[in-house]
Swiss-Prot record:
It is found in: Cell membrane. It is an enzyme of class 2 (transferase). Its EC number is 2.4.1.227. Signal peptide: none annotated. Gene3D superfamilies: Glycogen Phosphorylase B (3.40.50.2000). It is a peripheral membrane protein. Pathway: Cell wall biogenesis; peptidoglycan biosynthesis. It catalyses: di-trans,octa-cis-undecaprenyl diphospho-N-acetyl-alpha-D-muramoyl-L-alanyl-D-glutamyl-meso-2,6-diaminopimeloyl-D-alanyl-D-alanine + UDP-N-acetyl-alpha-D-glucosamine = di-trans,octa-cis-undecaprenyl diphospho-[N-acetyl-alpha-D-glucosaminyl-(1->4)]-N-acetyl-alpha-D-muramoyl-L-alanyl-D-glutamyl-meso-2,6-diaminopimeloyl-D-alanyl-D-alanine + UDP + H(+). The gene is murG1. This is UDP-N-acetylglucosamine--N-acetylmuramyl-(pentapeptide) pyrophosphoryl-undecaprenol N-acetylglucosamine transferase 1. It comes from Bacillus cereus (strain ATCC 10987 / NRS 248).
């Protein structure tokens, strides 16, 4: 099978694509890949580092207000379609999949117009502009949340989940706990604000640290590398309790996620895919700074099923943070109920499900 993949701009579009590619390589070692992204996007460094052939096109996103820049965007889109057709004809893929971000617009559109089987993968509850546009032309739309399905033609929608979920399975949680200094017998909560950290969560944590010192559970706090020194300076003034471990970053996150009992985090699509695949209860603090407030809608999909609590950033304080953690970790029945609810939402074989959809389209 020859697979052309496109997606970029943020890790939320790139990492699911890479997870899918890794799964296909396991199931079909003869498969060949080409990834098309932008020259300046994250994908231009991440994808080649993963050993995947990479080509770039020039494209930009539409501004939401009327702007002369949108005229340039249309011209770039048309040029991107022509460049994509050239790459497609040269690579001759059996199938093309877009995982979001404006770069996959011209790529997937060009493939559809050339009669090649096409799929878009939507990670969030609220679809992006590009995937909504492409849904008119592609063969299938793979979704991760039921709420996303209503935005697409129903005959094309298939629930696959996020391929990243597959990558957190079969991890050694005990090894993960040991690697960060957590003790095995004690309950533990991991708190983090995304790969770069989040200042409002850091501020609430610093305010709460003295009260955390009185708890029977352990706290693993990840500041984000850019915030680490500032957080540690503030912590030194208050004292660092023995049951609180602070790290700038965690490189073996799947192992650590597997080992802890509760997670406090943002509500990005990849994070939720991983948490539900592991059956992990959570307190979700959606980022209010994302397009269409999609993180709050992502969180709502999990909260409504009883798998998480939601704490809006505007309501985030030391007191509300500790309250929500205590209500879950200190109540064995609540913890167990939320574990079961999260597990029922999870799709741990998401990458394989998406590959099955691809196979069916190729064999048509």
């Amino acid at each position: 099978m020859r697979v052309l993949v496109s997606g970029g701009g943020t890790g939320g579009h790139i990492y699911p694509a890479l997870a899918l590619i890794r799964e296909i390589k396991k199931l079909n070692p003869e498969a060949r890949f080409l990834y098309i992204g932008t020259e300046n996007g994250l994908e231009s460094t991440i994808v080649p580092k993963a050993g995947i052939p990479f080509q770039s096109i020039v494209i930009s996103g539409f501004k939401r207000k009327i702007s002369l820049d949108n005229v340039k965007t249309v011209m770039r889109f048309l040029k991107g379609v022509q460049d994509s057709k050239r790459y497609i004809r040269r690579f001759n893929p059996d199938i093309v999949i877009g995982t979001g971000g404006y770069v996959c617009g011209p790529v997937v559109y060009a493939a559809a117009k050339l009669g090649i089987p096409t799929i878009v993968h939507e990670q969030n509850s609220v679809p992006g502009v590009t995937n909504k546009f492409l849904s008119r032309y592609v063969d299938k739309v793979a979704v991760c949340f039921e709420a996303a399905a209503e935005h697409f033609p129903q005959s094309k929608v298939v629930m696959t989940g996020n391929p990243r979920a597959s990558e957190v399975m079969d991890q050694n949680g005990m090894k993960g706990k040991r690697s960060v200094g957590l003790s095995l017998p004690k309950k533990s909560v991991l708190i983090f604000g995304g790969s770069r950290g989040a200042r409002p969560i850091n501020d609430a944590f610093v305010e709460a640290i003295e009260q955390f010192g009185n708890k029977s559970y352990e706290i693993l706090y990840v500041t984000g590398e850019v915030h680490y020194d500032k957080v540690m300076d503030a912590v030194k003034q208050k004292g660092n309790p023995n049951n609180v471990i602070i790290k700038p970053f965690i490189h073996n996150m799947p192992e650590v996620l597997t080992g802890v009992d509760l997670v406090v985090s943002r509500a990005g699509a990849t994070t939720l895919a991983e948490l539900t695949a592991l059956g992990k209860p959570s307190v979700l603090i959606p980022s209010p700074y994302v397009t269409n407030n999609h993180q709050e809608k992502n969180a709502r999909s999990v909260v409504d099923k009883g798998a998480a609590k939601m704490l809006l950033e505007k309501d985030l304080t030391a007191e509300t943070l500790i309250r929500d953690i205590d209500e879950i970790l200190l109540d064995a029945q609540t913890l167990q109920n939320m574990k079961l609810a999260a597990g029922q939402l999870g799709i741990p074989d998401a990458a394989n499900k998406l590959y099955e959809v691809m196979n069916k389209l190729v064999k048509k």
